[in-house]
């Protein structure tokens, strides 16, 4: 049993060492250019209660959860769909509960 544990520990050490060597092979310039490309891809999020019909995955995050683009047909006979970023009620209650717990123990 002890031999098996030693072999497993040796394998884990070798695997972690080989993966860290691969990271060291990247040059700093390449890593910086990759990060710059990632930052340019980020787009502005849509605030709560604003129109999100142009991009339904663009809603901003609250302190804990991401808002959801909710679509509905308003009353009044107009059959045009309206979409806004909203926070679901169950997530709203969860955020309030965690805030109260943090204030109680924090």
Swiss-Prot record:
> Which Gene Ontology terms cover its molecular function?
toxin activity
Identify the Pfam families for this entry: Toxin_35
The protein's location, in the record's own words, is:
Secreted
Q: Where this protein primarily resides, as one coarse class?
A: secreted
What does the record list as coiled-coil region(s)? none
Q: Which residues form the propeptide?
A: 21-41
Its GO CC terms?
extracellular region
Q: In which tissues is it expressed?
A: Expressed by the venom gland.
Q: Where in the sequence is the signal peptide annotated?
A: 1-20
Say which family it is in.
Belongs to the neurotoxin 19 (CSTX) family. 02 (D7) subfamily.
What name does the UniProt record give this protein? Toxin-like structure LSTX-D3
């Amino acid at each position: 049993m002890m031999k098996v544990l030693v072999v497993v520990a040796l394998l884990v050490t070798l695997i972690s060492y080989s993966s860290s060597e691969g990271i060291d092979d990247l040059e700093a310039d390449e890593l910086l250019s990759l990060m710059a490309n990632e930052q340019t891809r980020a787009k502005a999020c849509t605030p709560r209660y604003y129109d999100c019909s142009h991009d339904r995955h663009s809603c901003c995050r609250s302190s804990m959860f991401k808002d959801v683009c909710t679509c509905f047909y308003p009353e009044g006979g107009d059959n045009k769909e309206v979409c806004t970023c909203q926070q679901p009620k169950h997530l709203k209650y969860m955020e309030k509960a965690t805030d109260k717990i943090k204030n109680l123990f924090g």
